[in-house]
């Protein structure tokens, strides 16, 4: 059995020892075994019991000589040097360099043999190397040789040219072509292998990208919660500072009143009326007293803007939720994954946290549905069918932390927050000068402009909370017609749609105001003079939406068109149309999005002029029932939100 194991050794060392000897010395295993038997018998003979005294004396004398020899310094140095020598040095001392190289190439250890990968390729490594070589020289020589044989059909004497190639040459040519075909097959297999390898790498990269995206989403959620807590602390600090200032002002006023009353005690008795006592206060002290209800523009600046939506493909859905039970009439957001305000015909105004997709509260106070709204930092303005405009300060919201975190896994929503918000104290004041429903509004800084069905525009001062001036649209149109700037109230000769809002859209910036009305006109006002500075004629239907920047003004109308105006020239820069009326529109630096009576959002790329659709209706024919028609859209930094007729609100990347 042992012999069989030695002969069948996978490394083949026994065969090598039998053939080449031990360490290349020519001594085989049989010689070693014979030498061992001789040493054993000799030692047994010398050390065993024997009756010959000369033999034992001879052995003792030999041991004494060996001991004396080992005590010499030269012998000890040799023994110590041999003890420090490694087995590798011993092998190198016995084998030459060429023999070592030959053994390293011809014999491999078992560890390396086990690590050899399985050969699943149809071609060898050498064939792959040959296939990668450039055969340009072969093609060049091959074409030259064939062209020489076919250059002339006859010689100069008119005789036949050289006869065709011999059979040997044709066979050689065929072998060469066959070899080239084999190389082509090897190259095809190599290309296929590279494609498979690239596909695997792409799949791995996609998995890695998804993992990093999930990590980024978690970081942004944690960042939003931390920033929410920081804003709460900042608001508390501001409130405490205001309370301290108010207490100091009241103390100063009380001290001044006491001093005044003490100095006049000998002249007349103190009045029993508190109002009479207050009359002795200094007017400067009154001016220092804070207003019980004032609008605080606390600019909520993001320390780092969300970037998760920028890493999704355009048209990807981010969130979708049932926001209302009826048609969405207005919506707006402050920044991507921030705060969103929605209003619908169900007479509710809701505040949403887009980071978690949950409603954080209601803005209650209107007696009818809200038709228009806007959020800027922490301030929200809402215009309703009850002819009022209300201002809300979201920084006054009270946040209560929930300590009960039991049964968190039973919640259907995987994302939850540890706080709930009460918006009861967010209302600042109401602006109620209109006599018709408010259909459009816009504010910037401390200036707010509202448009109503009473055919007027009102300019409001948000610091004082009162109307500064009223702009009569009909009077301005009549004045422009009398001066010849406008041909008539309706230049197209068409009656406006009865369901269309008289004031469809407004936007203000500093002293500039743009207003779109039901006659299809876009008027540019100067708020300092209250006069129309310029009128843009082009739409044949009521203007439903508009927005302008430093150079262009974009308008959408129920005449199914969107027009881009050049504010410097006062002329049309570009225009395009859709199949149905445009009800809502907004643009950013890259795209213009619009709701045009379909179940998708219409997107227009400014750079290349490409039109494409975004929304749930893109694949509705394949997935199931058609979604509802989109009524309102808003766009901020590539983050798109859209509200539908069935009350669903969805967020998309754009």
Curated annotation (Swiss-Prot):
InterPro entries named in the record: G-protein_beta_WD-40_rep, WD40/YVTN_repeat-like_dom_sf, WD40_repeat_CS, WD40_repeat_dom_sf, WD40_rpt
GO cellular component assignments: mitochondrial outer membrane; mitochondrion
PROSITE patterns linked: WD_REPEATS_1 (PS00678), WD_REPEATS_2 (PS50082), WD_REPEATS_REGION (PS50294)
SUPFAM superfamilies in alphabetical order: WD40 repeat-like (SSF50978)
Entry coiled-coil feature ranges: 209-247
UniProt key word Mitochondrion: yes
Topological type in the membrane: Peripheral membrane protein
Keyword terms of this UniProt record: Coiled coil, Membrane, Mitochondrion, Mitochondrion outer membrane, Repeat, WD repeat
Signal peptide annotation: none
Pfam families: WD40
Residue spans of biased composition, Basic residues class: 139-151
Biased composition (Low complexity): 249-261
Any single biological process term in GO: peroxisome fission
Protein's cellular compartments: Mitochondrion outer membrane
Residue ranges of WD repeats: 323-364, 365-402, 433-472, 478-535, 538-575, 577-614, 623-654
Region (Disordered) residue spans: 135-165, 249-274
Family as reported in the entry's similarity comment: Belongs to the WD repeat MDV1/CAF4 family.
Function: Involved in mitochondrial fission. Acts as an adapter protein required to form mitochondrial fission complexes. Formation of these complexes is required to promote constriction and fission of the mitochondrial compartment at a late step in mitochondrial division.
The protein, known as: Mitochondrial division protein 1
